[in-house]
Amino acid sequence: MSDNPAMLGAAKKDKWVGPFVRAIGGRMTTGLDEIYSNTTIPMAFSGISKTAARTQAQKHGLDYWYIDTGYIGNRRFKTWFRISKNDFQVTIPIQPRPADRLKKLGINRTKFARGNKIIVIPIDGKVSEGYGISDPDTWLEQTVNTIKQYTDREIVVRHRPASRETRVTTDTFIGALQNDTSAVVIWASNCGVEAAQHGIPVVSLGPSACTHISGKIEQIDNLPTLDTDQTEAWLRWLSYNQFSNSESESGTAWRILQENYASIS
């Protein structure tokens, strides 16, 4: 165990966080006591509702790295993991990147015809806790009421299927998108990314990877068509902010992230 680690990792299971921190000379924490006593070392963690590392980092002005399911390219099994600095998702401005990593993912980018319905994705409990939203039901009610101020379109609230197996096989979001959908409204759900990659406009009400391609809620009745070039640049950028475990282990993830955040104070 290093007495002077470059980074401390915090997670219930270290299969995502461990490879990332160890590649740069860090290690996993010994527990909550070490997290709360740390005032100098950057931290990495997973689990959006596991806020101890984030709270401690913010309290003492430390950088933290958050690791979670990747934005694009995961299918039945999770092989890609997003890593963002001082945020739950990458929200810094889009930077130009080549297409190599995006092509490697081989994602389905079929453009779907827009229909008439507005899909609203509720915030689940863990996400609301991470973002400090005390009552997800109130958020949903207020969001639906706001949408009704600007459109008479049918509003469909799509709750997340409990089983990942169901989500990726029989009750898929991609299927819902093809069912007469005009736009998707999220807080910070990855459903927004999936919608945009198929040409369905998104309104992101919270800080998310969709922030820079998001429309405004006031435009919900007739959101502009997504710009093809902007969407391409955005998807390339996302592909440079998510990594496989082998890329974390090799230090590739760290190297790319340093380039991504080099100009961000």
Segments the model singles out, each with a brief description of its role:
Residues 27-77:
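Extended catalytic core of nucleotide-activated donor transferases of GT-like folds
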